Amino acid sequence: MIDKRDDKPFKLKSKYKPSGDQPQAIESLVDNIEGGEKAQILLGATGTGKTYTMSQVISKVNKPTLVIAHNKTLAGQLYGEFKEFFPDNAVEYFVSYYDYYQPEAYVPSSDTYIEKDSSVNDEIDKLRHSATSSLLERNDVIVVASVSCIYGLGSPKEYADSAVSLRPGQEISRDTLLNQLVDIQFERNDIDFQRGCFRVRGDVVEVFPASRDEHAFRVEFFGDEIDRICEIESLTGKTIGEVDHLVLFPATHFVTNDEHMEQSIAKIQAELAEQLQLFESEGKLLEAQRLRQRTEYDIEMLREMGYTSGVENYSRHMDGRSPGEPPYTLLDFFPEDFLIMIDESHMTMGQIKGMYNGDQARKQMLVDYGFRLPSALDNRPLRREEFESHVHQIVYVSATPGEYEMSQTNTIIEQIIRPTGLLDPEIDVRPSMGQMDDLLGEINQRVARDERTFITTLTKKMAEDLTDYLKEMGVKVKYMHSDIKTLERTEIIRDLRLGVFDVLIGINLLREGIDVPEVSLVAILDADKEGFLRNERGLIQTIGRAARNVDGHVIMYADKMTDSMQRAIDETARRREIQIAYNKAHGIVPQTIKKDIRGLISISKTSHNDISKEEMDYESMSRGERKEAINALQKQMQEAAELLDFELAAQMRDLILELKLMD
């Protein structure tokens, strides 16, 4: 029996107090949630402290909360901020645990089968288990997730029912406990004690839960009774303290008992027979042979080991679901009355909508050619309407909400005032004729004031030509193109802030992490060319890049005024008017945001130096030298992941793959 602690409130800790229009935004959001409003939008301008407002709302409504971001980097940033705001509550992180993932696929045109290949990040796997176990044990939980949270995860009921509950004085034999641990996919390993393992020393069993990374538990027996349970340091075995109740959740999210397993296998066999009959009737003998061989091997593994590679493809049978029925996901681990917050909703909701179709197209090919049973199609992400069915109450958070969010609710709460008093920038529209010389003059003014400039173009050629021109004119400039790796990108932004160069040119400067307070000018070339980067939403996002500096200014170079330009200019002017009135009424003098220029953490410096060296000469390395380089990078990748610098870890992974392909 799991004792769920449901009486612990969220406790927000911060040296800040709500300011600007944060108080009214917080009050409105809380009142609407408590009044039963299903959906609302927090329309927060760049730099207004949306995460702090979200934290205040969570602490006041006191509901388990799922925060969804559109990529791992943003999720990691939010996770770090929420951990600081709620040190006494359970703040969890749930993203895809793959450092590298090549999904199973088949290309009929070349008769190429691509086997699933992946590298699981142990640290993220631990955090995923920590998230699900926290949700089943307590209510004061915030889970920060990527869209990975809408993918199949296994039944929360089976996961909870399989948990092993232990207390001092409980009558249970040591061997019974060992059998129970094996049933929930723990492995016995008396030598290499790590997550998901247990070891036995006489009447003492030590267990390392899948949700922990440093602390394990020691269960001491006296005959067929538990004498004592202690929390211990996994490395030294040193006792930290005694515990009066220990719940051990399964070491995998896909778990089932023996009786249920046999029922599942019977269903798999029945589906196999049906599909084989179909293939044979169509004369697809190769596909039939392939499917029989693969599926019978998986069935044997399930019988003997309780697990097989690709077990998730049989999740419909394991969960007892009907064909087409949505899979269990992280959302099913939450209680009914939970709150969802969608960060950067204009991006995230588009991702949620698009996940299902791409997944189905790939899997249908595997089914058609005998690599998987049709039930594999039900191991999938949720459709958007299925996601909506899980929504009890939701807050969409964005500076530029999308059409979908606007169609879901008329309740829009604005957060326009920045705590620093900063205004949205002034905007000029200038003709494209003579734009190079005009822009050069503007850049020189900024250089004289030790300020920086962003320039955004629409094409790679324009960016390259402009970079060459400015260099000829003596401007210190860099072009950030799509081929630049994330690690280099971080270094480029840092160098821009330090004044190593003064102008950064790019095609898409909307990506996260491009907020630079030193930037006082944003120049938008071809502003009148309608499209993704020049629609109203894209323009407002780009304009926001100049909103961190008191002298922020935007120049749009265009030969005509498009509807998108006009709407973006009008919206910026409206916000600016509100901000000026507020500052005047409260005697606030705008100040440029003070943001430390952090030295890259030691691992980043080391890794970057290593990468630069290897990028210069790894082609001339011997195979042995390359192997040493790969080993060093793998270690650094793990260290980066442990520091939750998953962006850096991903770059390490990509370089490792490049090096491996050379041998």
Curated annotation (Swiss-Prot):
Region (Disordered): 1-23
InterPro entries, per the entry: Helicase/UvrB_N, Helicase_ATP-bd, Helicase_C-like, P-loop_NTPase, UVR_dom, UVR_dom_sf, UvrB, UvrB_inter
Record's keyword terms, sorted: ATP-binding, Cytoplasm, DNA damage, DNA excision, DNA repair, Excision nuclease, Helicase, Hydrolase, Nucleotide-binding, SOS response
UniProt motif Beta-hairpin: location: 97-120
Record-annotated Helicase ATP-binding domain positions: 31-271
Start and end residues of each Helicase C-terminal domain: 435-601
GO biological process: nucleotide-excision repair; SOS response
A molecular-function term among this protein's GO annotations: excinuclease ABC activity
Biased composition (Basic and acidic residues): 1-10
Pfam families (UniProt xref): Helicase_C, ResIII, UVR, UvrB, UvrB_inter
CDD domains reported for this sequence: DEXHc_UvrB, SF2_C_UvrB
A Gene Ontology cellular-component term: cytoplasm
Coiled coil segments of this chain: none
Domain UVR: 627-662
Localization terms from the record: Cytoplasm
Binding site for ATP: G44, A45, T46, G47, T48, G49, K50, T51
Quaternary state and interactors: Forms a heterotetramer with UvrA during the search for lesions. Interacts with UvrC in an incision complex.
PANTHER family with a match to the protein in the record: UVRABC SYSTEM PROTEIN B (PTHR24029:SF0)
Family: Belongs to the UvrB family.
Entry comment, domain topic: The beta-hairpin motif is involved in DNA binding.
Its biological purpose: The UvrABC repair system catalyzes the recognition and processing of DNA lesions. A damage recognition complex composed of 2 UvrA and 2 UvrB subunits scans DNA for abnormalities. Upon binding of the UvrA(2)B(2) complex to a putative damaged site, the DNA wraps around one UvrB monomer. DNA wrap is dependent on ATP binding by UvrB and probably causes local melting of the DNA helix, facilitating insertion of UvrB beta-hairpin between the DNA strands. Then UvrB probes one DNA strand for the presence of a lesion.
Protein name stated in the entry: UvrABC system protein B
Organism per entry: Streptococcus pyogenes serotype M12 (strain MGAS2096)
